UniProtKB/Swiss-Prot annotation:
Protein name: Photosystem II 10 kDa polypeptide, chloroplastic
One GO term (biological process): photosynthesis
Species per Swiss-Prot/TrEMBL record: Hordeum vulgare
A Gene Ontology cellular-component term: chloroplast thylakoid membrane
Lineage: Eukaryota, Viridiplantae, Streptophyta, Embryophyta, Tracheophyta
Disulfide topology: none
UniProt function note: Associated with the oxygen-evolving complex of photosystem II.
């Protein structure tokens, strides 16, 4: 019944004051404000040397694992043009930050202790969650 009543009503557009034309002579109403977007010039990422073919990686006999000759392309081909490669790749650890010998942990005893405490906390927290949701807890 209500569907019949709703269908019989004639719908007309509302006269909103925002949709009415401007009464001033010579002034055109604007449907939207003018918006100008200006992009700033991007900063160039500076790297001491690009990594990859031509940037420190040397393949045995100049051939990669698939048997193709490395041309120094990929993201590293734009190092001279943009100051870095396309995606601004920067490795977390650079050769300047490496330990002189790989057999000494740079964090020392304090770092190892903190690592062990963190690992133990994660394992104990997981065990507590398993225990608290099991039938043994009730």
């Amino acid at each position: 019944m209500s569907a019949c009543v709703m269908a019989s009503l004639a719908l007309k557009p509302s006269s909103s004051p925002l949709l009415q034309r401007s009464k001033l002579g010579g002034v055109r109403p604007s449907a939207r404000p003018s918006l100008v977007i200006v992009a700033k010039k991007a900063k160039k990422v500076q790297t001491a040397q690009p990594y990859g073919p031509g940037g420190g990686v040397a393949f045995k006999e100049g051939v990669d694992a698939s048997g193709r000759v490395a041309k120094g392309k990929g993201v590293y081909q734009f190092a001279d043009k943009y100051g870095a490669n396309v995606d601004g790749y920067s490795p977390i650890y650079t050769p300047e930050e490496w330990s002189p010998s790989g057999d000494v942990y740079v964090g020392g005893k304090t770092g190892l202790f903190l690592w062990a405490v963190t690992l133990a906390g994660i394992l104990l927290g997981g065990a507590l969650l398993v225990y608290s949701t099991s039938a043994l807890a009730s």
